[in-house]
Amino acid sequence: RYISVTGVQTCALPISAALKAADAVKKRIAWVVLQKIKGTPMDDVAECPPVDDKVLTMDEFEFKNSEVLHKPTSKIFTFVEALKMAYFNRMSLGEYAHFKTEGLGYDKAKGVGTPFKYFTNGVAASEVELDTFTGELKVLRTDILMDLGRSLNPGIDHGQVSGAFVQAMGWVTSEKLYHNKDGKLLSHSPTTYKIPNVQDTPRIFKIDFIENNGNTANVHRSKAVGEPPFLLGVSVWTAIKDALKYKSGKAIPQIISPATPEVVLMELAKYDSQL
């Protein structure tokens, strides 16, 4: 969905590289529109000059509702018209920019500072069922709660969270690497390296978001959601350990990851030998 320019500009901290690049393109479009309003023949202009406050006053322009408004003259151009003017007058509509997050620093000795501009937090609870004869696992239910600030697209964020969780679930339950004595990887294909499929996903899978406006460091007060939910998949591994503890009646076992059916059966065999 479209995020209004006014909403983006409410970020108190410097904009990202993408927004910096977009801002440069906006200035070029505004400059071309201004030449059109002034009636300047574009053949007399070799190229768009470096656009700064001396050349162009961006406050005179408003980009909104797919239109470009020049406030002093009240002239309005559709966004398509403005783009065509820029394109056919050989103005670049592409740009790149670099951005370095400001205000970061951390004193390891004192344990104080700001190592990251913001944190993406989440919590997950998983319920599992173990087959004591085969060591196979079923994830009966998983509930996830994520803090993503103000979500730009809840549908995409939901997919990111669920995908990262399932990926991590496979990482801690089935994705085991095998090497021969020479160090050559043997589990190098789907036939030897088991990744989770749709049947491995939680039978009940609920994901919810906490929406807040506290993150001023990112676009539209949103938060990144690529990798952070991956760590929540560890809840499946810890649930397996709790299930084994219930079976043994003793302390939580120190099993390895991934907790494959073989690992589970070997742990269960220890309990049988102790009976």
Each model region followed by its residue ranges:
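Single conserved hydrophobic/aromatic residue that forms the stacking wall/gate
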Residues: 1-11
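C-terminal catalytic domains of large/alpha subunits in multi-subunit enzymes
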Residues: 12, 16-275
